Amino acid sequence: LTVSNTITASGATGRTLTLQSDNSVIFNTGADVVTTNALQVVLNADHDASAVGAITLGVGTVIDSKGGNILLGGGATGTGFAVGAGSTSPNDRGVDLSGATLNANGGHIVIRGRGFAGTGSDNYGVYIHNGSTVQTSGAGTITIVGEGGTGTNSNQGVRIDGNSANGTTISTVDGALSITGTGGTGVGGGSGGFLRGIRFIAGRVSSVNGAISLTGTSGNDSGNDNDGVHMASQATVLSTGTGDISITGTVGGPASLVDNDGVTMIG
């Protein structure tokens, strides 16, 4: 299912827009969801649970639900995992947000993705990058769950990338913000490494009064750099009010290898 033009909803509050496919759900560059009143938005890939069906939002895509909940996932009801659908990017990621915006305006946001199970590398569960924004306000919460796939290496559960030009941000106001990532595996238990639960490079995760939780478990192979949570290049986790911050990392493979750490923070 490919969306190439903006979807506009003008009905009463409380309606639901469901985009459902047995395979992938793809928003081309600049295709948006625009609504006058609160709208529940469900992007449901891999509806037939065949383990093939990713969600990809392109550069400039904006989904603004005006207070409705936003769900990106897979399976029969969309509450399971969207699953990487091929060995080349972005299809190898369960959910890929590249320069896209999700704004629930007080509603809840849930994102669930699992990387491609096959060959290659970088089969991320959830990849949020290139200046993407995931945000809500009021008591709205954000929940992101990612599981890395199978491949040569670098099959990370959740990867967040930002830089000075493209500041990827994930934020709430009073609601909880939870990111949970589980690294995948190398082919045949290979030695590729970099099977991080959460990799967070630059960018910003923040809340005012909501609790922030980052929980990562690395994958298990005989390689190095399998961190539970890896933060670098001025990655920022910030509470500006009363919200607590919890960062928990677990090594899924041999801790005796190089840089297989629960939590790593670099500059």
Q: Which residue stretches match the model-derived regions?
A:
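Extracellular beta-strand scaffolds
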Residues: 1-2, 7-10, 23-28, 32-34, ...
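Surface-exposed extracellular loop regions of Gram-negative outer-membrane beta-barrel proteins
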Residues: 18-20
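Short, flexible, glycine/charge-rich loop motifs used to bind or transfer phosphoryl groups or to couple energy/partner
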Residues: 267
